[in-house]
Amino acid sequence: LGQNTHELVTRLLSALPLSVRPRLVTSDGEFHTIRRQLDRLQEEGLDVVTVAARPAETLADRLTRLVDDKTACVLVSSVLYETAEIVPGLDIIARACSRHGATLLVDAYHHLNVVPFDVHACGLEQAFITGGGYKYCQLGEGNCFLRVPPGCRLRPVLTGWFSEFSALPREGRFRGVEYGAGATRFAGATYDPTSHYRAAAVFSFHIDQGLTPERLRRISRHQVGLLKDAFEALDIDAAVARVEPMSDDRRAGFLAIRTDRANEYFHGLRTRGVLTDFRGSLVRLGPAPYLSDDQLLESIRLLRDVHDSLRTQARLA
């Protein structure tokens, strides 16, 4: 467990044999945690190879073709954070990494608790998986994890004293740097774990309410579908704003609307009491399971109001 995915990802990167395997393969659809860190490592001379995230249908195949014996790690999301598109075929990447002795890191942040995620069904038994509870798990800040595959013997350079906790009571001087068993080899040092107790309480609430990943997926698909249908019924010119195209079963936990005026849509909705966010030219509408259909439809009505207001301003300019 960790406070954020960055501290966990960097510990993993520090364990890789980058001096003899300097290649890192990734996509341009990764969240800034990975994107920024890899950009900086590239400045230091590592061979960071980046491919287009879309079309997502072919992303796994395109990443796989780039894996070779110089590849230390492939870093890819299971759901694209900008568009909510589910990336298929991660097992193909996993097999390629296994053949070449490379590591696979899957960012599942936008997958968890909104789309069922089965490590074994996805063929990711030997993959590292990172994610957190800030979004769909609704755990608040400070709840992230790194799933470590069984039998891992990596020795991270960035390592804290929690990783040798079991060795501390022994007498005498330490002989070299020892690591704990299993995932503890990636442990850090002292931090405030209060957030984990909050997370445990939230998960207990989910269990009490019967909010399983499968049920949450059904709720999410209904809500996102409702938003999509309501937006498309507005009949806004697609050159101005349109739903990011993908099949409904490939869309995860939010509706992405592409518009050159994403910033203005965001602020216009916010002044009307609708909280969204935007990434570049994409407005993201992410419904929580406790919102009613009427509230969601009202948000689209207010989006229409924002659109009409912007159009009026443009005519008067």
Where are these regions (language model features)?
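Conserved beta-loop-alpha segment that forms the PLP phosphate-binding cup at the N-terminus of a helix
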Residues: 1-20, 32
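PLP-dependent aminotransferase-class I/II
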Residues: 26-76
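Active-site phosphate-binding strand-loop segment of PLP-dependent enzymes
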Residues: 56-113, 128, 136
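PLP-dependent enzyme catalytic core of the Aspartate aminotransferase-like
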Residues: 65, 263, 267-317
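Active-site PLP attachment segment
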Residues: 123-175
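Structural signature of PLP-dependent enzymes
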Residues: 179-229
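Conserved PLP-binding catalytic core of the aspartate aminotransferase-like
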Residues: 218-228, 232-272
